[in-house]
Amino acid sequence: LETTTARQISRVQLNAARGGACSWMRDSQQLLCHLVDPRRGRAPEKPMVPSGPIIQETSGRVGAIRTYQDLLKTPFDVILYDYYMTSIPTLIDVGSGRTTQLASRGIYASFSPSPSGDYFLVRERVKPYSYLVPDGRFAEEISVVAADGDLVRELPGKPLQEATIVGGVPVGPRNIGWMTGRDQTLTYLEALDGGDPNADVEYRDRLMRLELAASPQEVLRTEFRYAGLSISESGTGFLSEFDQPTRTRRLWRVPMDDPDAKELLWERNSEDRYGDPGTPLTMLNDDGHRFVRQDGDWIFLTGAGASDQGDRPFLDRFNLETGESERLWRAGSDSYETMVAVLDDDANRILTRYETRAEPPNFYVRDLESGQRTALTDFPDPHPQLSGIQKQFVTYERDDGVQLSATLLLPPGYVEGQRLPVVVWAYPREYSNADVAGQVRGNPNQFTRIGGYSHLFFLTQGYAVFDAATMPIVGGNLANDTYVEQLVASGQAAVDKLVDLGVGDRDRIGIGGHSYGAFMTANILAHSDAFRAGIARSGAYNRTLTPFGFQNERRTYWEAPEVYFSMSPFMAADQVNEPMLMIHGLADNNSGTFPIQSERMFAALEGHGATARLIMLENESHGYRARESVMHTLAEMVEWFDVYLKNAEPRRITF
């Protein structure tokens, strides 16, 4: 950095197929890198004739897993996987360029240094692979090696995870990693319920501790599913556990040397954003590991600060002995400001990201004692020509009393009382009860940034946008039993509110969404006449093709066939009587949203005489990245609503 010149450290070929090819060691003098085997040779060529059939077999083992994409499909895929993923873990001295090979060539899921850098936790993927699950579920051999490459200890491996059910966890050791502040200590988890969330047991998990030269020891057991552990430099652990059926989350204070003395700090509904006390603040230590910042009996908490006025992030001090909480900072009510980092041990100086409706996000250093704010960046408005966009936060009510909300955006030059074509954009979410479903999310003071294929581009074409309109599906684990009814009610409430505000008229309001929002769009058009037209991007429309669960639905198709059927707009394609535009990436790798979902939905619509258009984008995934794809998507969306919404003839009224 002093000379601003770059130099080559070593003449090696890095292997970045698995992600980051190099990472810094603690001393900042060495890099841990994954290298290509110099003897690897040219990539294998696909044989002209298949080597044999593709075979899968099951033998009575239950394995209800979700649908995945981009999996290994053929024996040749296995050969390519081995070729590209094989690497040699190596230490490279930055000063001299000297290399130290740490292990033989293999396929490594991770190669993690201990806090001191003297040891490495090695997770190596081994055969047999699977055609059913992604490589993160492949079998692994696990061991610890020293910095000179010598084997220190072999650990229990991870079996192939083809039988882990939806909502469950693997059987055997999982989440193994170095314990913060301990150079020769590992922690890992073991399921006590066989990995089955439906099993009726006293405890779900147990946390284990393993000294490299000793036998494993049980630290504690959790009644709910383990959800995370952070440790302070003084050795105090903060352990979280979560119960999905009740949405209950607990946070425990655990002295790691005396875990029997653990103390419950709080138990709360994870969906209750208003009541969230925050999350313990973590910082990086000299070892490059995260630890909870603790000052005597005090720790720091950060959170979104959700309220009925929107999110106002905060930083608190929390006393572990008294339960007393002291507010150090809270974002103002006329802006949106998030805390990025604490800059000193006493949390007197913090780095924040500040924005308003008129000012784009910039970074500032805040001195909490003096109140002074110092700008670090001065990023300009990326689109000043759109600075006249008007924004207001809107609340309204569904016919069953559930509170709803959205952000109404009006185009530059809008005159009050003018009725515009309106685009309602939404994404449904499930909740356990109506109170938490009605809580406000987001902040109306955020800067409106328009980019990519955002639906906010409609603001440049004379449309109003009813953004992030809430579509809550209330009812806990059985919420989807009334999915369609609640969805239609939420959509109707949005239309009624827009009409009451004097912004829209019932003949020119459209609905749109991406992914689960596309699923929502198709359902609303099938079961309601509230909207004039719709846009559905990268969606799934036939839930029988995701038979082992989706979103928060844990029941399988065979456990709740009527729910899967009634929720699938494909089954109601004959009822879709509003124009629908569908867009999908041909390389969509998102679980459940196979491109065939859009292809079959379009075929069903065409077969019943509906007005529809299907756009399949080559080489695009769940989101679209190529400039050509982004521009084409925007053009299709605007043209569709221009024809079937903005300039559409009034609908006939029948009696």
Features from the language model and the residues they span:
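Beta-propeller folds
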Residues: 1-388, 403, 438-439, 651, ...
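Extracellular/periplasmic catalytic domains that process cell-envelope and extracellular macromolecules
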Residues: 15, 25, 179-181, 418, ...
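Conserved hydrophobic/aromatic pocket- or pore-lining residues that grip, position, or stack substrates
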Residues: 142, 186, 265, 363, ...
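Secondary-structure transition/capping motifs at alpha-helix termini
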Residues: 145-150, 210, 214, 243-246, ...
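N-terminal cap/lid segment of alpha/beta-hydrolase-fold proteins
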Residues: 377-418
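Short beta-strand element of the alpha/beta-hydrolase
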Residues: 410, 418-429
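Active-site-proximal cap/loop segments of hydrolase catalytic domains
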Residues: 429, 435, 439-655
